[in-house]
């Protein structure tokens, strides 16, 4: 870190020396600000680090510094751009330092229509990695069955990734984002600007307290994503059901069976049509001369569709 002119106090360390690179992929999901990776000239080397960055969609989120033969006359420290090949004369004694970079806003018209990489979104500095991952986000957007127009609530919006990507797909939607975490509102607003979209409202606070005070135009949602709620999730779902527009739908990603067991009866009691599924994805990670599939956390998805009213 002295060679890079950067303090080391906030740095994390990880050894891949002769090891499976899977722990590196897991650590990258936490989005450390600085990560020193002890590498190996064979297995667990700089190429495995680069492959892990690509597989995680974070290649542009980190500056990769290759440090060779430190403290010797042949010492060499250089930054490798994503498009730059690994040096053919790589010294066997080397390590890699990854430094998080503030990413420039990508041109909105150059982004893909669907399935944005995780690295596109700015994240909470105190909880990096706390966002809906791309694979889950794609599934949630499909489950929301987005209408061309209407009101979409994203409750417990986090970085705003799901709601904002929905707004790119359906620009005529009125999007309401509510996030309780401090700094959530400016973060979502910044991500909206990066994606070239404009939510109808972004609120910072407890959803249970914010919903009763919504303007009339946003008071009856056509689609709702509940990404948070914690211990209040049952009461929050009950309030959503009371406010749902005719033919409305609610989608709830869950981490535990207990949460599913708590919320599913609430939808059934309201005569909602209920669907339960699980999203499980794997990402390719380097393994020796090949590729292994590293599992991501499974997510349960609970979906409820409001009962049709007579004549609907």
State what each model feature region is:
Residues 33-128:
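A contiguous loop/helix-start segment that scaffolds small-molecule binding in enzyme catalytic cores
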Residues 71-95, 259-261, 266-310:
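Active-site capping/gating segments
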Residues 1-31, 208, 269-294, 298, ...:
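Class I SAM-dependent methyltransferase SAM-binding "motif I" and its flanking Rossmann-like core
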Residues 159-171:
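Conserved SAM-binding loop of SAM-dependent methyltransferases across substrates and taxa
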Residues 149-158:
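Conserved class I S-adenosyl-L-methionine
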Residues 178-220, 232:
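S-adenosyl-L-methionine
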Residues 172-176:
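Short beta-strand element of Class I
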Residues 170, 244-246:
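Helix-to-beta-strand junctions that scaffold the AdoMet/dcAdoMet cofactor pocket
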